[in-house]
Amino acid sequence: ELVSEFCLKKERVCEDSSLTISCPEGEGIVIYDAIYGRKRGEVCPGLFGAFTKNRKCRSSNSQQVVENSCEGKSSCTVLASNSVFGDPCPGTAKYLAVTYICSFL
């Protein structure tokens, strides 16, 4: 199934914040990618530049957790926290980034 990049939606929140994603009525969320951790240095730097300890880390269950909460629903909210995803890189400021589309149910 080919999906135009223009259809892909991307949302991101810093650690300890809630991410809410939603689709128009009659459409459901399809998760393409989700990462809880860190891929980029300049995003959500944290206090005193805490991101510098580990710039590339990712919780292995990131996508599964978000899919379980969101897949097929018209909207969902996920808390970006170690209590939800585990801590893939202690001492590093993390964020949750989700890429998804809205698809007709």
From Swiss-Prot:
Chief location: cytoplasm
UniProt domain SUEL-type lectin: residue ranges: 13-103
Gene Ontology MF terms: carbohydrate binding
Record-level GO cellular component terms: cytoplasm
Subcellular location as annotated: Cytoplasm
Keyword Cytoplasm among UniProt keywords: yes
Keyword tags: Cytoplasm, Disulfide bond, Lectin
One Pfam family cited in the UniProt record for this chain: SUEL_Lectin
InterPro entries: Lectin_gal-bd_dom (IPR000922), Lectin_gal-bd_sf (IPR043159)
Keyword Magnesium assigned: no
Its job: This protein binds D-galactoside. May have an important role in the activation of eggs (triggered by fertilization), or in their subsequent differentiation. The dimeric form is essential for hemagglutination activity.
The protein's assembly and partners: Homodimer; disulfide-linked.
Name recorded for this polypeptide: D-galactoside-specific lectin
Organism: Heliocidaris crassispina
